[in-house]
Amino acid sequence: MRVVIALGGNALLRRGEAMTADTQRRNARIAAQAIAPLAADHEIVITHGNGPQVGLLALQGAAYKPEEAYPLDVLGAETEGMIGYMLEQELGNLLPFEQPLATLLTMVEVDADDPGFQNPTKFVGPVYDQAEADRIRTEKGWVFKQDGEKWRRVVASPVPKRIFEIRPVRWLLEQRTIVICAGGGGIPTMYEKGANRKLSLEAVIDKDLCSGLLARELNADLLIMATDAETVCLDWGKPSQKAIHRARPDDLTQFSFPAGSMGPKVDAACHFARSGNRTAAIGSLADIAGLVRGERGTIINGGFAALGWH
């Protein structure tokens, strides 16, 4: 099977962990250990989040003069290289030398008139208490929103329209290469109006929506949204909580899921499952082999007879 694996933001940096290279390296190793056993039987494409990493780079860059600070699109490209390098090396340490791996910088087309630019919603960077967030807001002009009990920076999150590097990804897959691409949702890019020239924008594309687009453009058989939750649940955190095992896209669209966490994953999974009656899975990275077999997590396919529970 051709499988696209979207690693959640916790894959390289869990909430509360220090944003050090050693921490991210350790978590990359854990992700590689989960994914490597699939390589013998499947074509693998890996995407990943980059919110904490790109936010940290932006904060570091804010120490420079305004004209010296790098924009978010450049920072996103930096994180694609950094995270891809760690994942690629850790996978290479587990797989035979003959198994090719490649990390690909990925530009993704967006619409400059996307309404997302008028209402920033995408969390990036570390968490702050309110006093610290207020101080940075005053100094840097950043927009902050509450994330649980803490505060995080938010930026625009336009909808991805097209992946510019989709042909190189296909070429690499034809050679049985494990491809790491579209990190952090890819680099937001648009054509300059009236000209055949690409421009990049200060924004962050939702990694789940981009992963779904990538899976559709690659005609993948399975899209896996690997997260820190074992399943999609109804009434999360309540006594009435129920874990969904199997569902059709229409079963899930009748429910409401948190916009900042499970919501985009469910939306992307349902959109993919509707395209050609394909299968999507949402679950824990540790259960990834069970997700491929359809035994663990939440499996989404239009052919199921009814909603099923764990």
Swiss-Prot record:
Indicate whether Nucleotide-binding appears among the record's keywords.
Answer: yes
Reactions listed under catalytic activity: hydrogencarbonate + NH4(+) + ATP = carbamoyl phosphate + ADP + H2O + H(+)
Q: What is this protein called?
A: Carbamate kinase
> In which pathway does this enzyme or protein participate?
Amino-acid degradation; L-arginine degradation via ADI pathway
**Keyword terms, alphabetized:** Arginine metabolism, ATP-binding, Cytoplasm, Kinase, Nucleotide-binding, Transferase
Family (UniProt): Belongs to the carbamate kinase family.
GO CC: one term?
A: cytosol
The main location is cytoplasm
Q: List the disulfide bonds.
A: none
Q: Give the source lineage, highest ranks first.
A: Bacteria, Pseudomonadati, Pseudomonadota, Alphaproteobacteria, Hyphomicrobiales
> Which NCBIfam families does the record cross-reference, listed alphabetically?
arcC, PRK12354.1
